[in-house]
């Protein structure tokens, strides 16, 4: 009967329900159940006093709200809600702003986005197939050697005029 629904329980009278901002919203807004101050350049755990049960094959990703990121420099961290977790949903807020960020009870602080996942069997092997990329990581697929091109632009004077 409830198999494909996103189910939730309010763990206190301070919890808000899951709210979609619009009919086409990908996420469900999560609201703070208690007031919290996130210090400037600091972080805080904000409890929602909600427990959830995801439909089969889905997990929850706690994502930032774009307005908080743009206007208040607030971001969200460590945002995976495993489908078998039944505890109080907490949201880690990072404040990249110069002023403390005050969260009031009921403030929408993040959104819960449901995503499909797979859990294939795990197999330890002696080696992996080779690829053209190999073990090149961290920027290896970006635009060439950007720092050399930038330096050449500055040293030739081409870019200096853009910044004056």
Curated annotation (Swiss-Prot):
Signal peptide: none annotated. Substrate binds at residues 65-67, 79-82, 90, 138-139. Its cofactor is Mg(2+). Pfam families: dUTPase. InterPro entries: dUTPase (IPR008181), dUTPase-like (IPR029054), dUTPase-like_sf (IPR036157), dUTPase_trimeric (IPR033704). CDD domains: trimeric_dUTPase. It catalyses: dUTP + H2O = dUMP + diphosphate + H(+). GO terms for molecular function: dUTP diphosphatase activity; magnesium ion binding. It comes from the Viruses. Keywords: Acetylation, Hydrolase, Magnesium, Metal-binding, Nucleotide metabolism. One of its GO terms (biological process) is dUTP catabolic process. Disulfide bonds: none annotated. The modification N6-acetyllysine is found at residue 71. Its EC number is 3.6.1.23. This enzyme is involved in nucleotide metabolism: it produces dUMP, the immediate precursor of thymidine nucleotides and it decreases the intracellular concentration of dUTP so that uracil cannot be incorporated into DNA. Belongs to the dUTPase family. This is Putative deoxyuridine 5'-triphosphate nucleotidohydrolase. It comes from Frog virus 3 (isolate Goorha).
